[in-house]
């Protein structure tokens, strides 16, 4: 029974390696279009200089202020 379990585990690891699991869930999303434009949030009309974040339209302006 244990050898069957070992074979099954080996097959599963070969078909779905642990490196395929993304472990960077706490990282912010990569926005290449903003990086390519040399985006500076300080020049955005939604940027709040006091809080150092964007108050509106978080799709365009980063970092977004918490509510």
From Swiss-Prot:
Record keywords: Cleavage on pair of basic residues, Disulfide bond, Hydroxylation, Neurotoxin, Secreted, Signal, Toxin
Disulphide-bridged cysteine pairs: 53-65, 54-61, 58-64
Keyword Metal-binding included in the entry's annotation: no
Record's protein name: Conotoxin TsMMSK-B022
Compartment list: Secreted
Protein source organism: Conus tessulatus (Tessellate cone)
Signal peptide range: 1-22
Alphabetical list of InterPro entries matching this protein: 4Fe4S_Fe-S-bd, Conotoxin
Residues cleaved off as propeptide: 23-50
């Amino acid at each position: 029974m244990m050898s069957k379990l070992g074979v099954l585990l080996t097959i599963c690891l070969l078909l779905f390696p642990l490196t395929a699991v993304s472990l960077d869930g706490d990282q912010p999303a990569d926005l290449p279009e903003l990086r390519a434009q040399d985006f500076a949030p300080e020049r955005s009309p939604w940027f709040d200089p006091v809080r150092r974040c964007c108050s509106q339209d978080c799709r365009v302006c980063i970092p977004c202020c918490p509510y």
